[in-house]
Amino acid sequence: MSADTAAPAALTADAAVVGAGPAGLAAALELARAGLDVLLLDEQAEPGGQYYRRPGPEVLDAVGDHRPEGGRLVARVRAAGVRVLSGHTVWGVDDDRRTLLAASPGGAAVRVRARWVVAATGAYERSVPFPGWQLPGVVTPGLAQHMSAEGVRLGRRAVVAGSGPFLLPVACALLERGVRVVAVAEAGRPYTPGPASLGALRFPARLAELASYAARLARHGVRVHQDTVVARAHGADRVEAVTLTRFSDPERVVARHGVDLLCVGYGFRPQADLPRLLGCAVDRDPATGDTVPRLTPTGRSSVPHVYVVGEAAGAAGAPTALARGRAAALDILASSGRAPDRGERRRLAVHLASLAGFTRLTAALYPAPAELVPALARRLPGPTLVCRCECVTADAVRAAAAAEGGSDVPAVKGGTRAGMGLCQARECGPALEALRAGGPGTGTVPARVPLRPLPLAAVLELADTPGEDV
Ligand SMILES: Cc1cc2nc3c(=O)[nH]c(=O)nc-3n(C[C@H](O)[C@H](O)[C@H](O)COP(=O)(O)OP(=O)(O)OC[C@H]3O[C@@H](n4cnc5c(N)ncnc54)[C@H](O)[C@@H]3O)c2cc1C
């Protein structure tokens, strides 16, 4: 754990940045360099977030650093004077809708008041239930990627499935760890040439990266099935096999593979709970179905002192996260009278626009989650567990959704306890939203305090930790 983890109970700063991934690090660096007092809080033991995930010293010694540029960025952030609070989970917002409530690594209560709040909380992996998804040996691609990077071999024989460009590098990372990847199953048809894929020619570096993954998979004899999804994972005590079917024709079996590792995920969805608690207006993204904060191009939310950056603003990859973090910081500096270089802001805007072009291309090539997730949820067999924490089946959710008032997601949660367990709907949220009846009412899982499980002592202690005005 970092040395700089101990924090007094009430903290103030010019800017509080929540999340030390690429977006939060970039924002914090820019703000601190301009002379602002910046607090950077992250629940992980080390700063870096998902992309620059910093393994502990033993792992670094054993397998090396697969993204050393992340370590260099963290070092620059520290050198700029940012107060880094690792192991600090922001779990809520006080009644003033301004003071952040956090818990230290030891579970002590910490209040944070800042003139600006930058939410850089990243993304969740998008999971969709299927029969057998609760079996040991079934994991998300992000977890498989992280464990592989840390030298852990999660299985001997794997299938990687779901949708999105992330599946290919994950399959390659597994191969590097000596896992025999028998197949990649992609729900869409992104690798079949068509009018949309012509757009890829405008991004030669990305095309070359894709080609290198494809070549590695081909060398290892990995089949890439398109229009294919996981219908069922089989096994008694852990996953032993997987049945893959056509996405466009669920009755058609594509293959059944014996595996001891199944990695399934449908991309990423923004982690926007903190901005919602801070009162930021949100919209439903028509393409992804995700709840996203309403933002200016520089990440300013409807609450003027709150900015949302990186994947929390919409999944778009690490380079965009870095650029969004900087853009928000420059905007904050401009509004605080420390006018940053105009040319710099213009260059950043152009860079962001070019990155947005690639995000649009990706969205055009892979199936839109707003259609994919409900289609998968509709075909779920009744006894499939949707909420693994509270053991609620698809049939139970459907019955609650069909009852009076069932178009309301909170009513479905209340009637079934789905989404009310330890993970607070982080896993089953998209499926719950997709299974509801539609119609009036709240169609999204609400953001609720606490954002993470925390010791009761951290809440009780709050009464003794008065906030300070900023
Ligand atoms: C599991 C997973 C694995 C991924 N692996 C890759 C990969 O290998 N390659 C790739 O290109 N992309 C990967 N991504 C996508 C990745 O999120 C982005 O490319 C990039 O890391 C986004 O940067 P960010 O700063 O927006 O968010 P992140 O890097 O996700 O950083 C967000 C940080 O916020 C912290 N945080 C969130 N909520 C709180 C809270 N309430 N209190 C305190 N701290 C909080 C998190 O601990 C995290 O460190 C992965 C995503 C996930 C979810």
Residue ranges with predicted function:
Residues 2-416, 420-422, 426-470:
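Residues forming the flavin
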